[in-house]
C-alpha cells in the first residue's frame, strides 16, 4: 500500500485494540472513543474526560501553578527534569492530573482527572498536592468530590516523596468524609500501584469503566510471587465487582448521568 494511502487511512479509520475491527473516526468520536462492536473503552485524555462529564463553560481549573521539582536529582536514561519537560510539551499539561470545580448537570462538584498520557499518570508530589488541596477545598466549601483515576502508580523518580502522597491524600479524604461529604471514585484503565492502594479505593461510591485494568502489582508479578495461575479476569473491573470491591460498572455513555444521579441522591 502506498504511504499516502496508509496516511489517509489513518486519518479516516481507527483499529480497535480489542476486536481489531476498523472504526470510522466519525463513529469513534461519536461513541466517545468506545468501540461500537465490542464495547472496548479506549483511553481518554483528561481534557476529553472533563468535557465529557462537566457542563459546558462551567469548568474552573485550580492549582495549575503546582509543578513537580527534582529534589533527588534523579536520572535514569535521562534526567527526571528533562522527562518532565518532554511530557509537558507532548501533552500540553503541567502534570498528570487536572483539578478544578464545575457543574455536572447543574450540580457543583470538585473534580480531579488523572491523565495516563503524562508519565503513565504517575503520582508524584505535585499530583498528590493538587489532589490533597482539592479535597481540602471540598471540605471547606462542603462540596462533593469526584476523582477519575488513570495511573500506573507512584512516580519512582521521586522516591519516598511520591509514596507519602498515598497517606496524605487518604488523610485528607478521611477529614472530608467525617463531615458527611461525598467522594465518588471512578476507576478507568489502568488504575494500579499506589493510586489503587490509596485514594482510588476509598470512595463512598466506587464506579469503574467496563473491562478496566484495576489492581496493585501486575498479573505476571503476582503469579511469579505466589507461584500460582490467576483467574483470566483477575484485576479487571468485573472481577472486583463480583468480589464486592466496586459498586457499579458504568459504560462511558452513561457516566455523566450516573454521577449526576448519585450527587442528586446525596443532596
Swiss-Prot record:
Catalytic activity entry: N(6)-carboxybiotinyl-L-lysyl-[protein] + acetyl-CoA = N(6)-biotinyl-L-lysyl-[protein] + malonyl-CoA
Protein name: Acetyl-coenzyme A carboxylase carboxyl transferase subunit beta, chloroplastic
One MF term in the entry's GO annotations: zinc ion binding
Cofactor(s), by name: Zn(2+)
Chain positions of all zinc fingers (C4-type): 16-38
Species of the source: Cyanidium caldarium (Red alga)
Function summary: Component of the acetyl coenzyme A carboxylase (ACC) complex. Biotin carboxylase (BC) catalyzes the carboxylation of biotin on its carrier protein (BCCP) and then the CO(2) group is transferred by the transcarboxylase to acetyl-CoA to form malonyl-CoA.
Enzyme class: transferase
Family listed: Belongs to the AccD/PCCB family.
SS bonds (residue pairs): none
Subunit comment: Acetyl-CoA carboxylase is a heterohexamer composed of biotin carboxyl carrier protein, biotin carboxylase and 2 subunits each of ACCase subunit alpha and ACCase plastid-coded subunit beta (accD).
Upper classification of the organism: Eukaryota, Rhodophyta, Bangiophyceae, Cyanidiales, Cyanidiaceae
Gene that produces this protein: accD
All copies of domain CoA carboxyltransferase N-terminal, residue ranges: 12-267
Keywords tagged on the record: ATP-binding, Chloroplast, Fatty acid biosynthesis, Fatty acid metabolism, Lipid biosynthesis, Lipid metabolism, Metal-binding, Nucleotide-binding, Plastid, Transferase, Zinc, Zinc-finger
A Pfam cross-reference name: Carboxyl_trans
Main location: plastid
Cofactor descriptive note: Binds 1 zinc ion per subunit.
The enzyme's E.C. designation: 2.1.3.15
Positions of Zn(2+) binding: 16, 19, 35, 38
Top-level taxon of the source organism: Eukaryota
Pathway(s) this gene product operates in, as recorded in its UniProt entry: Lipid metabolism; malonyl-CoA biosynthesis; malonyl-CoA from acetyl-CoA: step 1/1
One annotated GO biological process: malonyl-CoA biosynthetic process
InterPro entries cross-referenced by the UniProt entry: AcCoA_carboxyl_beta, Acetyl_CoA_COase_Trfase_b_su, ClpP/crotonase-like_dom_sf, COA_CT_N
